[in-house]
Amino acid sequence: MNETMATDSPRRPSRCTGGVVVRPQAVTEQSYMESVVTFLQDVVPQAYSGSPLTEEKEKIVWVRFENADLNDTSRNLEFHELHSTGNEPPLLVMIGYSDGMQVWGIPISGEAQELFSVRHGPVRAARILPAPQLGAQKCDNFAEKRPLLGVCKSIGSSGTTPPYCCVDLYSLRTGEMVKSIQFKTPIYDLHCNKRILVVVLQEKIAAFDSCTFTKKFFVTSCYPCPGPNMNPIALGSRWLAYAENKLIRCHQSRGGACGDNIQSYTATVLSAAKTLKSGLTMVGKVVTQLTGTLPSGVTEDDVALHCNSRRSPLVPGIITVIDTETVGEGQVLVSEDSDSDGIVAHFPAHEKPVCCMAFNTSGMLLVTTDTLGHDFHVFQILTHPWSSSQCAVHHLYTLHRGETEAKVQDICFSHDCRWVVVSTLRGTSHVFPINPYGGQPCVRTHMSPRVVNRMSRFQKSAGLEEIEQELTSKQGGRCSPVPGLSSSPSGSPLHGKLTSQDSYNNFTNNNPGNPRLSPLPSLMVVTPLAQIKQPMTLGTITKRTGPYLFGAGCFSIKAPCKVKSPPQISPSKSMGGEFCVAAVFGTSRSWFANNAGLKREKDQSKQVVVESLYIISCYGTLVEHMIEPRPISTAPKISDDTPLEIMTSPRASWTLVRTPQWNELQPPFNANHPLLLAAEAVQYYQLLLAGSLPPGSPGPITRHGSYDSLASDHSGQEDEEWLSQVEIVTHTGPHRRLWMGPQFHFKTIQTSGQTTVISTSSSVLQSHGPSDTPQPLLDFDTDDLDLNSLRIQPVRSDPVSMPGSSRAVSDRRGVSTVTDAASGTFDRSVTLLEVCGSWPEGFGLRHMSSMEHSEEGLRERLADAMAESPSRDVVGSGTELQREGSIETLSNSSGSTSGSIPRNFDGYRSPLPTNESQPLSLFPTGFP
C-alpha cells in the first residue's frame, strides 16, 4: 500500500540531483456554479468550515523565469540536433522566499526537477549567469567555477554592509563565493546576458564585464519610478534600455509615441470625475489665497517650479537605448555636450513615468508601460550607424488594457513575436496579438504555425498596398506631404493625446523624406483577447469562460491548490510584491498528465499554432495554459482579414512551493547535474567557435551523449573558412512574372524585306529590290515619320500563366515581341526607333529562296505567339528581356532583331490582310 501511494504521489526524490521531482497534475475545469461554491468556501474561514489544515508553505516574495546555459538554444549543442525528440529547452523557474530561494527545471518530459534550494535569509534578486561570450582578446577568468549564481540578499558576505547593498557571486560547481561587489545604496534588481552583468540601483545602473566582473560603465540619469520596479530597465542580447530623466533634442530619435485616441464610456466617466476634481481643487486654492496662506497670484505649482529652478526639471516617459558593446567606459551621459557614441535611440514613450519594459528575442521590438497601466506601447527600433538622431522609432501598437489603474510587473513575448503577455500586480495576465512588422492581427497572420509575410501574394500582385497608400495620401494621412501630417508615427492625428507634442515631435525631427519612416503601417490599437487571472483568494483551480469586455475572446479564471489562507489583501494594494506573477511561452508539457500511457513521439505529431503559456504566481503553482486562436464567431464570412478570438484552457499544474520540512539542496553538485552539464556544453561550444580548443580534448558529457561526432567535422584547420562557403537564399522566385499582369500590353512587330509602307498618306516610302542594299530602319529621319497616321490602338491582354515549356528558337526568329506598360507615358517615336533596331546583314539575298513560304509561315508564327497557353510560350526560353532606356523589349536570343511596324489584331487567329492600301499590310518577301 505504501508503495502504491509513493507511486501515485506527484513528488519523489531525484536520482541525479538529490532534489525533489514533481509530476504534472491534470487540471479539472469546473463549471460556473462549482467555481462560485469554491469561492465561497475560500472566503469562509477554515475554523467555521471545520476542514483540516493543509501543510504549511513558505512565503514567496518573487517568482521569475530565467534564461541561462540550461535553455540556451544558440550555444548549447544539445539543442542543435535536428529531427530528434527531447531536445526542446527546459523551463527554468526561480522562486524567492522570505528565507532563501529555490531553482526548478522543467524539461520536456514534464517532471519538474529541483536544482537548487537554500535558506540564508531574504533574497531580493538572484540570477544564474550565462557563460560569457569569448573573443580574440576576451578570456573567462572564472571558467573553472561556472556556472555562477549572483545573489542580492539582506546580509552580504562581509556582514557589515547595509541590507541589500552587496552582490555575491557563488560557484554552483564548488559552492564557494568567487566575487563580491559592494555598493553604498540598496540594490533593487539584477540583469545579465552573455556580455555584462547589470546591477540596478535607485536612479543608477552599473554594468560589469561578464568575463572579469570589472566595472564597464554606469548610468546616473535614470528617472525614478514609484514601483514595483524602482528603476525599470530592459536588457537584450546587446542593447540596454532604461528610463531617462530628460529629453535631449540633439540626441532625439525620429518617431516615438503616438496618441492612443481611445475614448470609451469608462474613460469618459473618469475624465468627467477628474474635471470635477480639478474644479474643486481650484476652489480650494482660491479659498487658501483669501485666507492668506499663500500670496495672491502664487499657486503650489509655481512654488514647486521655483524650487526646481536651480536645475532643469525631470521629464517622465523618456527611453534611452544604448549599445553595451560600443558605449565607452565610465559614465554614460546623454547631454547636449556629449557625443552619441553607443546611444542607439532616445525618444519619448509615455507621458507618465515608465514602469516596466522588455525586448523581444531579436531586440528590434520594445514594449513599454507607464505607471497608470492603461495602455502599453510597442515600438520598433531601426538603428542608424551615424547617430541616435537618425534612428527611426516606429510606434506599431498601443495595447489597451483598460481604464482602471494597474501596475505592470512582467512582460513576455512568444518566440515568434506574435503574442505578448503583460502581467499586472492585480494577478491578471493579458494576452495580446501583434505582428513583428505591425498591422492588424487577423486570421492570415495568426492562424498559421509560422510567421507570414506582411503582404500576401494576392496583395502584392494586385497592388492593393499602393492603392491604399494613394488613398491615404489624398485624405491627408500618414503619407500626406502637408506639413504637420508627416509620414512619421508622431505626425499621426492620433498624437493629440500627448500634451507636449511640440516639444516631443516636430516637423524637422520627423522628416517625411526619411526613407526609414515611409511607408509605415498605421498605428493599431489592440485589446487583449484573453485575461488569465490569478484569484485574490486561494482555492482549487477553476475556470470561467465568457466574452471579454474589451476583446473578442474568452477569459479564464484559474486558482492554485488550497493552502493556508492568509489575510485577505487586495493584490493591487499588496506591498513587497506579495501578489507576484510571471509568464513565459514554451512547448507543451501536459501530455504526460493528460495521457500517461501515450508516447511523446505520437503526441508531437500535431503541430500547434501557438505555444503553451506557463504562468506561476506567488502561491507557487505553475500552470500550463493552452491558447487556441480561431476566427471570431460573429463574423458572417471568414477571410484572411477576419478578426481573431482565442480560447484558453489550463492543462497541467505543478506545485513548486516548498515547505519548512524540505531539505536544502546546495553545491557542490554531482557531475551529472543539469546546470553543470549545460555550462560545460556551452563552454565547449565557445572554445570551438574561438578556435582555442586544445587538440584531442573530449567533448562535454551531456544527457543525450557526447558531441564529439558533431564537433569533429569542424575542428580541423582546413575547415576554418567553412562559413564563407555557405550559400544562402534570401528570397524565392516570383510566383508570376511582372509582364503577366493586366497592366501590360503585347504588340506584334512585323518585318518587311522589299517595301515598307509607313502609311498611305506618309511621304516616307522606302523601296528597294533584291539587289539593292537594305536600308536599316534606324537611318530613317525621325522628323519625317508620320506616327499619328499609324493609328496604333493599345491592346489590353488578360493575365497569362507562367510559361511551362518553350519552343525552339529557330521557330521564333520571324516575330519580335514588345512589352509596353499601359500606365506609363513616353514618346512613341523613341519607342519605334528603339524597338525596330536594324536589318540583319545580307537580309535581301538570304531571304529570296524562301519567299514563297514567308506569308504562310508568318501567319502561323503570329498565331502561335498570340496563344495564351502554358504549352506555347509567348516568350520562350530562347527569349530574353532587354531594357533600353525606359522601354523593355523581348528580343530573340539569336541576336537578329528585325525592325518592323506594330500592328493591332482585332481577332484571335484572324486572317492577315494582304491589301497594300492598308497602313500595316505588307509582309517581307523573304523570311528565314
Curated annotation (Swiss-Prot):
Tissue expression remark: Expressed in blood islands and yolk sac blood islands (at protein level). Highly expressed in mammary tumors. Expressed in eostrogen-induced epithelial cells of mammary glands. Expressed in brain, heart, kidney, lung, liver and spleen. Expressed in embryonic stem cells, embryoid bodies, endothelial cells and fibroblasts.
UniProt-recorded Gene Ontology molecular function terms: beta-tubulin binding; chromatin binding; phosphatidylinositol binding
Top-level lineage group: Eukaryota
Signal peptide annotation: none
Localization of this protein: Nucleus; Cytoplasm; Cytoplasm, Cytoskeleton; Preautophagosomal structure
Keyword set includes Transcription regulation: yes
Cross-link (Glycyl lysine isopeptide (Lys-Gly) (interchain with G-Cter in SUMO1)): 215
Biased composition (Low complexity): 480-494, 505-514, 887-901
N-acetylmethionine: residues bearing it: 1
Region (Disordered): 472-518, 795-816, 868-928
InterPro entries, per the entry: BCAS3-like, BCAS3_dom, BCAS3_WD40, WD40/YVTN_repeat-like_dom_sf, WD40_repeat_dom_sf
Cross-link (Glycyl lysine isopeptide (Lys-Gly) (interchain with G-Cter in SUMO2)): 215
Record flagged with keyword Glycoprotein: no
Gene3D superfamilies on file: YVTN repeat-like/Quinoprotein amine dehydrogenase (2.130.10.10)
Keywords: Acetylation, Angiogenesis, Cytoplasm, Cytoskeleton, Isopeptide bond, Nucleus, Phosphoprotein, Transcription, Transcription regulation, Ubl conjugation
GO cellular component terms listed in the entry, alphabetical order: cell leading edge; cell periphery; cytoplasm; cytoplasmic microtubule; euchromatin; intermediate filament cytoskeleton; nucleus; phagophore assembly site
Functional summary from the UniProt entry: Functions synergistically with PELP1 as a transcriptional coactivator of estrogen receptor-responsive genes. Stimulates histone acetyltransferase activity. Binds to chromatin. Plays a role in angiogenesis. Participates in the regulation of cell polarity and directional endothelial cell migration by mediating both the activation and recruitment of CDC42 and the reorganization of the actin cytoskeleton at the cell leading edge. Promotes filipodia formation. Plays a regulatory role in autophagic activity.
Annotated protein name in UniProt: BCAS3 microtubule associated cell migration factor
Gene: Bcas3
